[in-house]
Amino acid sequence: MDILAIGLVVFSAVLHAGWNILGKSHAGSGVAFTMAASLSACLLLTPYLIWYLVTVGWATLPMAFWGLLIISGLAQMVYLVGLIVAYKHADVGVIYPIARALPVMMVGALSMLLGHSLTQSQWLGFVLITLGCMLVPLTGFRQFTPRSYLNVGVLWALVAALGTTGYSVIDKEALLLLTQAAGDVLGNSYSAIFYLGVQFWAMVLPVMLWCVVTGNRQELQRAWKIRKAASMAGVMMASTYGLVLFAMTMTDNVSLVVALRQISIVMGLLMGVWFLAEKWHYTRGAGVVLILSGIVLTLGKA
């Protein structure tokens, strides 16, 4: 990976861990927090979206791009809702690592199916990252058994991980179509920001429509009540994934970007201990070592 791409992903990890702390603080809001945060990002980026479409031309973008965008938006919503609901049942330090690291192996496998190659050391790095994330939720090494992961919180974290896997692979393919279509007019960085904005709209519109159709207007009211904290999280969410999307334009294999993003697990753990007074255990320390070792192995041959 390019050194600039690595720097962008690492900085995005700091922001990602930060908005997860805000999400934990408002875990009881569930879908409302996710909706409010996503909508704030939509409104922030809408003027840019209009400028981009006027500059590039609506008809320039292929229909396949819009189809991938819709699917990616739904996958993002699955991830966000799964994550926030999981926080109702467990610590940030438990849920965050599982939801973020499990997709490493999943995206790696999908990348292979799409024709990308991975070295043995990179696969070993993926395994270490995944093992590290499995250790982090435990309070003791004797708990490293299947029973420790059979609970509602981890189940929702798995749902979030599936969402992450989906949008990570789809976004890379959609970005490729977008940059090819707009490449003669605007550079890749402009297209990455545009994709970020339209993706947020693809996330939030289905949820708002669902609330209206089902008569669940309480979620809309709750979203309004927590708009200040959610807006801050929305800005962080937009900044976080915008940096990742830009990094994706600099590398062919999205699995490397996904693996590097797991440094946010370490940051999330530290923030959970510092800001939310969550406990630190030896297992979490061991998990952090495995995660960092896995990242080094993954990038060593990248």
Locate predicted features.
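Membrane-interface interhelical linkers
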Residues: 1-14, 18-23, 28-71, 80-90, ...
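Hydrophobic/small/kink-forming positions within alpha-helical transmembrane segments
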Residues: 13-17, 46, 73-81, 101-109, ...
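Hydrophobic transmembrane alpha-helices of multi-pass small-molecule transport proteins
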Residues: 45, 108-109, 121-140, 283-302
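Specific alpha-helical transmembrane segments that line the substrate/conduction pathway
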Residues: 71-76, 87-133, 197, 201, ...
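Extracytoplasmic gate region of multi-pass secondary transporters
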Residues: 167-176, 249
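Hydrophobic alpha-helical segments
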Residues: 238, 242, 250, 254, ...
